[in-house]
Amino acid sequence: MRHIMAKSLAPTDGVRDYLAAQEKKSLLRFLTCGSVDDGKSTLIGRLLSDTKQIFEDQLAALERDSRKHGTTGDDIDFALLVDGLEAEREQGITIDVAYRFFATPKRKFIVADTPGHEQYTRNMATGASTADLAIVLIDARQGVLRQTRRHSIIASLLGIRHIVLAVNKIDLVGFDQAVFERITESYRQFSRDLGFQTIVPIPMSARYGDNVTSRSESMEWYSGPTLIEHLETVSVEEAVVELPFRFPVQYVNRPNLDFRGFAGTVASGSVAPGDEVVVAKSGKSSRVKRIVSYGGDLAQAAAGQAVTLVLDDEVEISRGNMLVSPAARPQVADQFAANIVWFDEHALLPGRSYILRTETDQTSATVTDLKYRINVNDFAHEAAKSLEMNEVGICNISTRSPIAFDTFAENRTTGAFILIDRITNATVGAGMILHSLRRAENIHWQSLDVGKRVRADMKHQRPAVFWFTGLSGSGKSTIANLFEKKLFATGRHTYILDGDNVRHGLNRDLGFTEADRVENIRRVAEVARLMADAGLIVIVSFISPFSAERRMARELMADGEFVEVFVDTPFEECARRDPKGLYARALNGEIKNFTGVDSPYEAPEKPEIHLKTLGRSAEEMVDALEHWLNERDIAQPPPADNGGSI
């Protein structure tokens, strides 16, 4: 019985032949984009229908859904094939990115249907990130619109170099050649600086199928290809096989003591047994001994193939490393310039710390300079202090540790990255690396003989940063001042960084916007780190309202060195105390961006020390702090490290 079942489940010769034929076809990834209601989903539905990709039960369901949700009268509404969300069907719009696979005898396709509404531009950018070609739809009645320009500019920024200009709904203007030519010329004028290699204009009616897969009888004046003819024949390959070899290591394959290989997918270029390879960041080299695949050893592996590489030598390599060609290595730097498309409802702020993830690396990163925002309607450069959702900007980025990369123009796989919010773990932005910053390559750490351990030994204490956070009027400065006096009286070496005092000097140029608050804390955290490196016990007393910046400050310090102290006083009590009269003015609207009133305060979730002040004196708070300090032997010299040799 088991033998019969296995035999019945085995692929037939016909299936094998079909699969073999599919493997030989090239794959084209493309997306549809343009303004809302230009017919993007309808076009994809028409393509799927005319290329026989719809089963009978799907067609029956489509006819039923068209009667319920359709916008085409008694005709089938092909847009419903790809608008799967209930909200999309109810509103007749696309919200999320929908991917569909289909094939013709000549080629395989993966198409991304992207939304047209401006508030979903980030979804469109997601679809464009892997596409080779973009179909930009334009309603023949409307011409080139704001969102048409926006999507075209984003497609250009994301490396798409081939455009099909689909002038849709041509039937609604009487198949007028003059309308088609006017729109074509308008789009060419707009896009002349966007770097597109090809722009192929095609007049069509997605609803009725004119010039989609069959030539229109109503447009004898048009002699160009139908849409499917162009998609089947367009050459978009960027010769990734001819690019320098890049192999991001996904994991170390070690099934037994006698085998050690490095598994991953070849991102670009090719490799063969005997080829020399280099670990991108360490510079260690070896040679490829074997290329192992599921079907056996290979004589060569090229871009797109998932393989395991076995090397001649026992080179230290782990997940996240990248094997590369020694003749054309990627750049390794901790500072670079990049295009960023912002996805999140909370703005990108220079100075705020994010997690940056590339094909190979993950590290902390900060936008050190927002150079300008790109107006995606006319490509103009605009001054900006932040990037809001769906905006695009050019930024300088600094990473905590060096990463290996190519520019996005050279390699779309190793030149791209995403930014992740440290608190929510949400992907908040996507970036394309433009170039490394020369100053990053020319600045090196100077080796110094006197280090943190030596300085701390001399003071007979362990460095620490006590970071006091809480609302204005919570008692931070009072408690911090008493705490320093008690430490100083016992012979400890201390320094207080107070929020108000620092704004008279180091941060006098900053205001109280969210962006300025982020920069305020970034500067203070760097100063606190330097003071801890000097062996001091640093007491920082700042409202520091945002969790992300407090986490950034923590990561600057050595393990166990950062002590978050939450001075927890209810808002009502702080407003009652109001020692500086600020709450009264803020509640009257005289002060803007006041924490707790019209600017948020994100309370610590797990502070090392939680001081609940209501009904307790400042002296009691200091006693609790000192008890915590003594329990952890902060007064004792730190353990030996490599921080100094004297």
From Swiss-Prot:
List the signal peptide residues: none
From the UniProt entry, list the residue stretches annotated as the region Sulfate adenylyltransferase. Answer: 1-461
Tell me the Pfam families matching this sequence: APS_kinase (PF01583), GTP-eEF1A_C (PF22594), GTP_EFTU (PF00009)
Tell me the segments the record calls region G2. Answer: 92-96
| Region of interest called G1, as start-end residue ranges on this chain | 34-41
Write out the GO biological process terms.
hydrogen sulfide biosynthetic process; sulfate assimilation
> HAMAP family of this UniProt entry?
Adenylyl_sulf_kinase (MF_00065), Sulf_adenylyltr_sub1 (MF_00062)
What PANTHER family does this protein map onto?
TRANSLATION FACTOR (PTHR23115)
Protein name per the record: Bifunctional enzyme NodQ
